[in-house]
Structure formats: C-alpha cells, structure tokens
Amino acid sequence: PAKQVAFAEHAREKMLRGVNVLA
C-alpha cells in the first residue's frame, strides 16, 4: 500500500536525521 511506503520513507528520513544529530 502507498500509505505503508510513505510511512517507511518518513521513518527512514527520521532515523537518518537522528544519526546526523548523533554524528
């Protein structure tokens, strides 16, 4: 489902942002 894909994209972006903050 497109909604699930959008959620995965958002989660990945959020995780990457967190990694950037920790880096």
UniProtKB/Swiss-Prot annotation:
The alphabetical list of record keywords is:
ATP-binding, Chaperone, Cytoplasm, Isomerase, Nucleotide-binding, Stress response
> Per the record, what are the reactions this protein catalyses?
ATP + H2O + a folded polypeptide = ADP + phosphate + an unfolded polypeptide
Q: Where in the cell is it found?
A: Cytoplasm
Q: Name one GO cellular component term.
A: cytoplasm
The keyword Ribosomal protein is assigned to this record: no
What main location does UniProt list? cytoplasm
Q: How is it modified after translation?
A: Phosphorylated on threonine.
Instruction: Give yes or no: UniProt keyword ATP-binding.
Output: yes
Q: Which GO terms describe its molecular function?
A: ATP binding; isomerase activity
Induction note: By heat shock.
- The enzyme's main class, written as a single word, is isomerase
Query: Would you say which domain of life the source belongs to?
Result: Bacteria
* EC assignment: 5.6.1.7
Instruction: Describe, as the record does, how this protein assembles with itself and its partners.
Output: Forms a cylinder of 14 subunits composed of two heptameric rings stacked back-to-back. Interacts with the co-chaperonin GroES.
Q: What does this protein do?
A: Together with its co-chaperonin GroES, plays an essential role in assisting protein folding. The GroEL-GroES system forms a nano-cage that allows encapsulation of the non-native substrate proteins and provides a physical environment optimized to promote and accelerate protein folding.
In the record, the note on similarity to other proteins reads: Belongs to the chaperonin (HSP60) family.
Q: What is this protein called?
A: Chaperonin GroEL
Gene name of the encoded protein: groEL
